[in-house]
């Protein structure tokens, strides 16, 4: 069966540097820093006291009180981003068969904060099991897709792909496959994360994954820098409406970019550490290129996973050089996590949006907080440090690599 073309017709985002996708893009281009002291809870006893929170977030600005009680923050963020993307795309019952509209929205670890609070209330009680009626539904990852379909009546395929930090990139690839192979005419894809809480910060501290640069949190997320010491937790969500090309053209939709390939792989190495030579990332990128029918020389830009961890950033650079060879030096590379922090399961979605808007606008957002070169990272790699750069690009690749060694890569093409 001949595969169909797939395009992006709607975008939505709520992030630490902007609560709509235009605000997010403006923040990226201007190098806005989303880090600050944690306000979600008292972090005094924790090793990390800072994160990239969504600023001035009040759920009641977006939801009725009865729904604030029902949805954990990760699902709230996911629905906010999806609302924006759906409105931006213009898909509705008037121009789409809702039976053929799917939802592939996800999260890396779901409602961990709500789980913590309910568990603590139980532990501090007399042992009588008293749990709220929304405990389970506020925890489970697939609830984002559920609430979106309930609100909009989308009755197509609806499930969540969970692969830690690669979750929402996998969701975009799933959506791409559903449309190109004729199972859907449109899919709302993406994901969210809201793990800035006692469990999230405490758990990642215990793994030694988070930066502990408490004396200078604004410069803590510094991908590819010599003195990087771990990632900075972020929160928020991103959502994209993917649509079959002919259907989008027929209804006069605006088109941001075309999705042309996706690849995934496993490191088969370690539960948290990347393969030291980036072997899984190599396979993921190669498979995305093969899926798109592209040679390595076609890629102009890479939005790197780039978490600001000592091992991860180095392994990704090694993987890029192995896949692209000498052409790697012609590719602009950035990490937007330097500004947003790491949104965990939502990271791939907001970074896909950054890649798409870089293609559309011809601007590469910077990797901020670069001070000292890492001698282990090839200095000839064109990492865009500290200031945005104008550049006409035609193919952009976005990487997401998750704990468990689960990797995903998606490739977008500029729509002309």
What name fits each language-model region?
Residues 8, 24-25, 29-163, 178, ...:
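Conserved beta-ketoacyl condensing-enzyme motif
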Residues 1-8, 95-98, 292-298, 329, ...:
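Flexible, low-complexity linker/loop segments at domain and module junctions
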Residues 1-67, 89, 246-256, 353-367, ...:
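ACP-dependent fatty acid/polyketide chain-elongation machinery
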Residues 78-91, 144-145, 149-152, 157-193, ...:
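Active-site-proximal alpha-helical scaffold in enzymes
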Residues 5-9, 36, 215-292, 300-301:
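Condensing-enzyme catalytic core mediating Claisen C-C bond formation in acyl metabolism
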Residues 125-132, 173, 177, 181, ...:
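Glycine-/small-residue-rich "gating" segment that lines the acyl/pantetheine channel
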Residues 39, 183-229, 262-276, 306-313, ...:
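Acyl-CoA/ACP chain-elongation machinery
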Residues 85-97, 248-252, 285-301, 323-327:
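Phosphate/pyrophosphate-binding loops at sites that engage ATP/ADP/AMP, CoA/4′-phosphopantetheine
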């Amino acid at each position: 069966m001949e595969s169909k073309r797939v395009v992006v017709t709607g975008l939505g985002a709520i992030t630490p540097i902007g609560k709509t996708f235009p605000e997010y893009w403006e923040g990226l281009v201007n190098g806005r820093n989303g880090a600050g002291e944690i306000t979600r809870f008292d972090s005094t006893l924790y090793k990390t006291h800072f994160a990239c929170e969504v600023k001035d977030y009040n759920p009641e600005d977006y939801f009725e009180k009865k729904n604030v009680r029902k949805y954990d923050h990760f699902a709230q963020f996911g629905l906010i981003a999806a609302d924006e993307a759906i409105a931006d795309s213009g898909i509705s019952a008037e121009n789409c068969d809702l039976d053929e509209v799917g939802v592939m929205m996800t999260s890396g670890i779901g409602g961990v904060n709500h789980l913590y609070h309910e568990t603590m209330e139980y532990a501090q009680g007399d042992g009588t099991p008293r749990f709220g009626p929304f405990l389970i539904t506020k925890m489970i990852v697939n609830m984002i897709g559920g609430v979106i379909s309930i609100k909009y009546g989308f009755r197509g395929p609806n499930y969540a792909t969970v692969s830690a930090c690669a979750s929402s990139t996998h969701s975009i690839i799933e959506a791409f496959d559903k449309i190109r192979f004729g199972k859907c005419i449109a899919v709302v894809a993406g994901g969210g994360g809201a793990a800035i809480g006692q469990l999230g910060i405490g758990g990642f501290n215990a793994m030694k994954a988070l930066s502990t640069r408490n004396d200078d949190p604004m410069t803590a997320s510094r991908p590819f820098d010599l003195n990087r010491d771990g990632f900075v937790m972020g929160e928020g969500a991103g959502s994209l409406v993917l649509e079959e090309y002919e259907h989008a053209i027929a209804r006069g939709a605006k088109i941001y970019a075309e999705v042309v390939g996706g690849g995934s792989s496993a490191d088969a190495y370690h539960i948290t550490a990347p393969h030291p030579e980036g072997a899984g990332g190599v396979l993921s990128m190669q498979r995305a290129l093969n899926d798109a029918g592209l040679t390595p020389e076609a890629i102009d830009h890479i939005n790197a996973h780039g978490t600001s961890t000592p091992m991860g950033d180095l392994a990704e650079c090694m993987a890029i050089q192995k896949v692209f060879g000498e052409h790697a030096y012609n590719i602009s590379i950035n990490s937007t996590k330097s500004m947003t922090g790491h949104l965990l399961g939502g990271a791939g979605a907001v970074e896909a949006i950054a890649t798409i808007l870089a293609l559309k606008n011809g601007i590469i957002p910077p990797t901020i907080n670069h001070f000292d070169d890492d001698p282990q990272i090839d200095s000839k790699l064109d990492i865009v440090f500290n200031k945005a750069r104008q550049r006409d690009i035609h193919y952009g690749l976005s990487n997401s690599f998750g704990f468990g060694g689960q990797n995903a890569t998606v490739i977008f093409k500029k729509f002309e």
